[in-house]
């Protein structure tokens, strides 16, 4: 089961399924993974013998006035033919190609981790956007409740005004607050439409798809909570950290590869075939030819090229280590921030809910006193403002629970598990 299934929201599951299928960002990550797989195949090729076949046939005429004495030169045009198999195998004494394969394998695994990171970024971004949509719908409900309360207060003031118990100024002030509540409701409706467009873009779809997104569940099930033990091992599962570590391993292998360039290359070379003067003699005995033996080459003077390539490999490795450390520090901060906010939210929500209960009771009492002529309209409006602000605060904090849960999941890597290392990566 994927982490987002724990929210038990069928619409969210459907949206993520669409995003994973159609997102251009994931298509880019998959293309990069395919490229890394191809490079790994290329890197492993030099460890195997390279065999090729050649065949040629044609006619030739030799000069009578060149290096060969005229009396021994064949006359006229003559048919010639040759077929051969050749083999070249560079013995990897110094581990040059094993290091290259190890580097390519680490880069392939890093690409796999980067693809997982792309999935994590997409799914958490989509779920966070969905959480924002849920918050906006909750605020819309709060705004509708505010319109209803403001309307009731305005009606109450107007009734008392009609009986000569209230001033026109108080009625108009209540009407203004009702209009303000309606304006807020319209603004939230606009924000909901804009948020739907953002979600549609994450799906790789147009605005028409966004209009089909309904209201999220009123209270998505949040079960992940804080892990019992937040260890570095758990943090090390983050795909971006895994990718950075694997890139560092790859660049370390590149250093070994460049160091091997300073040592002799030892090749086993062999070829065998048949050649003849005249096609009809190609298969006759005596047409065979061949050779076999080692070939050794040693770089003597390269103008500093090998030293420069080694220094560049070492500098690239140092850079990758710094990038890994930066990624790790950023991850630690993200986890710490998410945990701090989640822990703080519990107390904030508890106090906000207590404040809402008190504000509702105060508004009810003041409204009753106002009807009995024991309170003025200003007290009613102040109590009403306090109650509505408390309601908005509680709504915001309840909606924030889902967002913080998503942020913690992203900070911890979304349950990513690196695949076992391929044995070809071992030197």
State each model region's role.
Residues 1-39, 137, 219-249, 299-300, ...:
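Bacterial Sec-pathway N-terminal export signals of envelope proteins
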Residues 207-209, 220-222, 339, 393-427:
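Acidic, low-complexity, intrinsically disordered peripheral segments
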Residues 5, 20, 76, 103, ...:
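Amphipathic alpha-helical coiled-coil scaffold segments and their short linker/junction regions
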Residues 97, 113-230, 341, 345, ...:
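Periplasmic alpha-helical coiled-coil/stalk elements that build and connect Gram-negative outer-membrane
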Residues 363-402:
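C-terminal structured "cap/appendage" subdomains that terminate the fold
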Residues 1-7, 17, 57-86, 209-227, ...:
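Small/polar, glycine/serine/threonine/aspartate-rich low-complexity segments that form flexible
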Residues 27-28, 44, 91-119, 169, ...:
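Sec/SRP-type N-terminal targeting helices
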């Amino acid at each position: 089961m994927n982490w987002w299934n724990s929210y038990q929201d069928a619409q969210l599951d459907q949206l993520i399924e669409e995003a994973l299928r159609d997102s251009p960002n994931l298509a880019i990550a998959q293309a990069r993974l395919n490229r890394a797989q191809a490079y790994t195949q290329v890197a492993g090729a030099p460890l195997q013998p390279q065999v090729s076949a050649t065949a040629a046939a044609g006619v030739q005429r030799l000069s009578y006035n060149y290096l060969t004495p005229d009396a021994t030169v064949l006359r006229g045009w003559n048919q010639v033919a040759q077929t051969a198999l050749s083999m070249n195998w560079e013995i990897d004494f110094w581990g040059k190609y094993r290091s290259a394969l190890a580097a390519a394998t680490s880069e392939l695994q890093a690409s796999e981790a980067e693809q997982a990171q792309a999935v994590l970024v997409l799914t958490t971004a989509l779920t966070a956007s969905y959480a924002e949509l849920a918050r906006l719908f909750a605020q819309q409900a709060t705004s509708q409740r505010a319109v209803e309360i403001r309307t009731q207060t305005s009606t109450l003031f107007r009734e008392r005004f009609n009986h000569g118990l209230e001033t026109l100024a108080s009625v108009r002030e209540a009407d203004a607050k009702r209009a303000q509540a309606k304006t807020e409701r319209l603004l939230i409706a606009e924000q909901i439409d804009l948020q739907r467009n953002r979600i549609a873009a994450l799906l790789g779809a147009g605005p028409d798809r966004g209009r089909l997104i309904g209201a999220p569940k009123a209270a998505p099930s949040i079960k992940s909570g804080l892990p019992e033990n937040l260890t570095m091992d758990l943090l090390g599962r983050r795909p971006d950290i895994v990718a950075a570590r694997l890139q560092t391993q790859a660049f370390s292998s590149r250093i070994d590869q460049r160091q091997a360039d300073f040592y002799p290359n030892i090749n086993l070379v062999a070829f065998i075939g048949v050649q003849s003067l005249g096609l009809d003699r190609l298969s006759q005995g005596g047409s065979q030819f061949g050779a076999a033996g080692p070939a050794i080459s040693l770089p003597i003077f390269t103008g500093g090229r090998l030293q420069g390539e080694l220094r560049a490999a070492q500098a690239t490795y140092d850079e990758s280590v710094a990038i890994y450390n930066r990624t790790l520090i950023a991850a630690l901060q993200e986890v710490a921030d998410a945990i701090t906010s989640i822990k703080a939210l519990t107390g904030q929500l508890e106090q906000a809910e207590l404040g809402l209960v008190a504000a509702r009771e105060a508004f009810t009492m003041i409204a009753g006193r106002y009807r009995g002529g024991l309170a003025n309209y200003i007290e009613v409006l102040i109590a009403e403002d306090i109650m509505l602000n408390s309601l908005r605060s509680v709504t915001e904090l309840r909606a924030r629970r889902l967002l913080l849960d998503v942020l913690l999941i992203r900070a911890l890597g979304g349950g990513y598990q690196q695949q076992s290392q391929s044995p070809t990566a071992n030197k």
